[in-house]
Every structure is written in C-alpha cells, then in structure tokens.
Amino acid sequence: MKRAMDGAKNEAKKSKDTDLFGRPLKKTGSWESKDNGDLMIFTHSECEGKEKIAAFDMDGTLIKTKSGKVFPTNCQDWQLLYDSIPSDFKKLHSDGFKIVIFTNQKGIHAGKVDRNEFRKKIEAIVGKLGIPVQAFVSVAGGHYRKPCVGMWNELKLRNDEVEINEKESIFVGDAAGRIKTTSRPKKDHSYADRFFAANVGVKFQTPEEFFGKSKVDEPWGPPNFDPKNLFSEEITELEPHDAQLKSSEKEIILMVGFPGSGKSTFAKMLGHQHDYKIVNRDTIGTWQKCVAATRSYLADGKSVVIDNTSPDLESRKRYIDVAKELGVPIRCFEMNCSMEHAQHNIRFRVLTDDNAAEISSMVLRIHKGKYVEPTLSEGFSQIVKVNFRPKFEVEEHEKLYKMYLIE
C-alpha cells in the first residue's frame, strides 16, 4: 500500500516536472496567481516592459485543435493557426512590441481543464512562438474575463513601470461579432475580443486581417446594446414626457420589466419620495400574498407600486381586477429596457457589489418568451414608459458602466 502511494506521489511530481510530452520541463518563465486563482499570469524570463503592446487571444487566434474538433480533447490538442505566426511575432518583437496573450479559460474554474496541464500548454505555445511572451489567463467570470479590462489593468502593473501607449498598441482576436455570410458559414460566438479592444482603447483586428493579411472588411454587429447611448441629455425619464410621477389620487402603479431593468430602483424611489407602498413577490412570497398586501395598503388609503416583472396578461390581470373591484385607477409603468440592456445592468451590479446575485440568461429569456406588450384595453388608465437613466456616486463605476460588459 505504502509503495503504491509513494509511486502515485512520484507520478504526480513527475507530471509537474515534465512537459505535455513527458520530457523534462525547461523553466522558461514564472507563474503567479491572483484572487484565489481567478487569474493566472505567465511571464517569460526574458520578457521586458514596452510602450507598444501586441496582444492576442489564444483559441481560434493563435492556435486551433489538431483533432479538428471545436473544443480541444486535451491540453496537447493544439497547433498554430498560421505557419507564419512565429516569424510574424519575431518581427513584432524586433519592432519594439511586447507580445501578450489574453485568454478566457472558464473551463479551468469548472473543473473541465486541469490547471497544471493548462500551464504546460501555455509554456509549450510560448516555446513554439520562439520569443518572450507574457500570458494572462482568466479562469473565472469576474472582472478579469474579457471584455472586462481586468487583465489589461494587471498588464499595466507588470510592464516594468513602462507606460503603455494604447494608440500604438493592438489586440487581435476571433470573437469579433461577425455575422453569417456566404464566405463565413457561422457567425462568431461572441463580441468579447472586439469589445475588449474597444474598452481598453486599442486598435482591433481579426486573425484573418492580422496574420492572413485579408483586406476583406467582414460585416459585424452592430452590438445589441451600447451603454454610451444612455447618456444623451435628450432622454427624458418618462414617456410621454408630461406623464405625472405621482397621482393626485390613490392608485396602483404596476411595473413591467426584465429582472435587472431598474424597476426595483424606480419602485424604491416612488416609496421614498412619494410614499407609495411597495409590493414585491421576492420579499412577500406568493402572488396571492402580494394581492392581499395590495388590498390591505389600499384599504389604509395608501397608493401601491407592484414591483414584479409582470410580463404577461395573467400576471397583470390579478391587480387590474383588484383596481376595478375597489374603484382605484391603475397605471402601467414599463421599463424601456431590452434584454441585452438588462444583462448589462446585471453584470455591472455583480462587478460592483459583492452581495449582488447573478441572474442567468435563461431567466431573462423566460421573461422575453412570456412577454405581451401592455395595452389600455387590459384596464390601465395610462401606460408610461420609464427610460433607464443611470446615476453614479463613484466615478470609476460610471467609467465601468460605459464599457461593453456582455460578450
């Protein structure tokens, strides 16, 4: 038994001291980890800080699978995407660029990819490239994951105190949001690389443009949501613009909107500033209890705001029936917020608030599938659109919100 355990330990040690092919591992650089391993950083021993950065995504940009499968079968299943990459990199290096890899690898966090084996893969790729490279590996889904700029910020801290010139730098990646065309049978899986470059403020190119020297301007996007468009002074809070926030008589306001659309923030404002009583299923429980609470507040002479998603006729009818029965007017306030906008808001909250809950895309898609546009014929006295106008107390939060956060 002891002999078997010792043998297993020796095999594990041997695995760490050998490369992907079992050969003695040559130490070409060093590894470090941040935030409990959420970010892994490899720095070649001859890597130097430079003003100009030539940065690259990895999968689908520098390498592809040998097996021909979409995802690698193991950490040895790779080959360079273009034969010219080593010579292209040597020219970049001689032209004064620092070569950097930025890669999202959530499979490590999920336990689908072995962390130590992946480190060997990075070192093997760097060895194949033949020049000093620094690699940043985002393992989880936080601010290090592209298109967020956490990895770029860490690069700035590890550039030998040399200030980076973003205008002279470039990022190359295949997640460019390109659409399906006759020459491209499948659309890109995401916008992450293009948006990462935009957030950082560097030039962006696809692998076809950079390595393949393609001059074809492939169509992409446009993005489903651009946060910078929200900061127009022309946007009013309510539509129609003359809609009254507070009614002069007792009423029900029924909110409609995606999770993450800002409706709860709006409802809290009505509560704090205008003494509306908030009815919310997340805090009260069942819809039956919500209806009972609505009746109770109205009986006490209070106006009520229903802070639920209310996407369909059935969920809204419960409160319309109460309004009719008690002779109280009911208005519908619908958040003017798309699913992509809601995703952005949720991502922002998670990045800025450790206590914020992640809401899955599936939940948003369910809301979208159930959605029926509110109409006056349902029994509403007025339908008001509420435009999301973000406000910030922290300058860094505003800067983050204006970035692309969704892949």
Curated annotation (Swiss-Prot):
Q: Output the Pfam families linked to this UniProt entry.
A: AAA_33 (PF13671), PNK3P (PF08645)
GO molecular function terms attached to this record: double-stranded DNA binding
Q: Which domain of life is it from?
A: Eukaryota
Q: Where is this region: Disordered?
A: 1-20
Family matches, as InterPro entries: HAD-like_sf (IPR036412), HAD-SF_hydro_IIIA (IPR006549), HAD_sf (IPR023214), P-loop_NTPase (IPR027417), PNK3P (IPR013954), Polynucleotide_phosphatase (IPR006551)
Q: CDD domains of this UniProt entry? A: HAD_PNP (cd01625)
Protein name as annotated? Uncharacterized protein F21D5.5
**Organism, scientific name:** Caenorhabditis elegans
